[in-house]
UniProtKB/Swiss-Prot annotation:
Motif (Nuclear export signal) on chain: 549-556
Keyword Endoplasmic reticulum (UniProt): no
Protein name stated in the entry: AP-1-like transcription factor yap1
Biased composition (Acidic residues): 79-94
Domain-level remarks: Contains two cysteine rich domains (CRD), referred to as the N- and C-terminal CRD's, n-CRD and c-CRD, respectively. A nuclear export signal is embedded in the c-CRD, with which the nuclear export proteins interact only in the absence of disulfide bonds (or otherwise oxidized cysteines) within the c-CRD or between the c-CRD and the n-CRD.
Organism annotation: Aspergillus flavus (strain ATCC 200026 / FGSC A1120 / IAM 13836 / NRRL 3357 / JCM 12722 / SRRC 167)
Amino acid sequence: MADYNTLYHQGLYLSPDQQDLLLAALSSNQPPQKQQNDKQRSQAKTDPDSTPGNMSSGSFSMSPGFNKTHPGSGGLGYGDDESPFLDFNPELDFDFPGSENLIGDLPGSLPSEEHEVGEKRKDMSDNENEESGKKRRESDDKAAKKPGRKPLTSEPTSKRKAQNRAAQRAFRERKEKHLKDLETKVDELQKASDDANQENGLLRAQVERLQVELREYRKRLSWLTTGSGISAMSAIPSAHSRNLYGLNNNDFMFDFPKFGDLPGGHIFNGPLTKSNQNKPRDGSSPATSDSQVPGVMTRETLNGSNNRGMPTAKAANGVSNNPSPKVPSVYNIRQSASSHDSSNSCSPSSSSDSHQSQMLSSNGTSPEPSSNSPATKLNDSVQNHHACTYSTIDGEASFCAQLGMACGNINNPIPAVRGKSESVSNTPSQPNNNYEQTPGPGLDLLAQQNGGQFDPVLFGDWREPQDAILSQDFGTFFDDAFPLPDLGSPSHNFNEVANPQPPKKDLIAEIDNKLDEEVVPGEDKSQMLSCTKIWDRLQSMEKFRNGEIDVDNLCSELRTKARCSEGGVVVNQKDVEDIMGRVK
């Protein structure tokens, strides 16, 4: 029985392999202690005499039977010679029912060898995962340690999104505001461009209208200066030239006065005239006082002296011996001077002086009758049979003067040729010194009441009553009376300015043209020859140069065919060729 107990107690101890399996099962949940287990296992292999009494301390207490000092003490060994029991069956199974309860409850059934291999593989994979996780953390730490600005990971993502949305919204608002500003600026520029275009159109229309008016005024000025060849600057007392040929064309001309001066004062020596007018006039010397009236021109005022050897004693006696009042004496002076000029019209000097007198009186805007009036042509019927020479430089002026008798002038619209017989019967042939035998003073009284000065500005809008002007430019009267509306008004039409409407036909003017054939039609101006052209044709004729042509008869024939125009007396080219053909 004692032997059995000893065997039983010896069988309760575990072999080293069993101890290793037990430790592995117990330490399966503690991987870091594997090295310690391996160390303990190695110690257990090197020390087989250790007992399992002190497992927790890493060494086993040996029983007295396993003492190495007693080789025959019956210690357990791998060799058969070391076993104390020679007849011991090694295949003896010590496991009996209920033997697992002898040493206490185990944490779990012992795993098999296959399960142990799986656990080892699992432990190896876990170790590898732990090592890879450490490497990853180490790599993250290395990446975070790079130089430069690190992203702010502390702020939440929602806050960053809100800031991004606010920035985008502000950008869109600025963009929309910029677009609105650009659209507003474009609208303003478009409006300014439209206004500028409209203003340019109005200014362009106004310029066209002014150009039309300028052409109209130039046309009127050409009627006064051209046509007869006389300019406003050449109409002065000392103008002894060929420009004096058309003095009987009845043009109403005056030079433009200086600012602040009355018209005509520079022609008649205004300061001297004013000083002479301020002197007291008495009845003893009416010739010296009344001869200074600007509207009355005598031979003494033109020539200053009788250097031409003309008989002027009769006119001088008629003036000096008359103690009548001033107005009749002035009229007698003018009448005697004009009759003296008409009686000596055959000589070139007298004809030129008479034309100078007419020119000065018209330039001074005095309303006295010209040399074509009946009062100055008292002795024309007596003097017409005298032969006149046209070889001097004033021959053209004399020829044009006789040819101009076919037309009237401003003061005497009746032509001198038609009113010759009437003027001879109603006007005395010789001037008398008595005031009762002379006609009324006429318009000279008005001129003298104004101090001898006549202001043509008062009659600036006056027009000559000639049918030729009315027939050619009849619409200008209505343009002045009813001017065009303002350019800004809606009733204004720009086409009316650019293309003026032709004037309507005047029935009264057509009737007058039918009755009076002495008016030049506007469409036949190219076929009309002026006095200058007729005189040039006469000079080109050899018989005229030799003196074989009767100029008086030729002038009378041309006068019967003459027509009146705004530029003077004109004759149809066909009539001139017929008359000159008969003379040849």
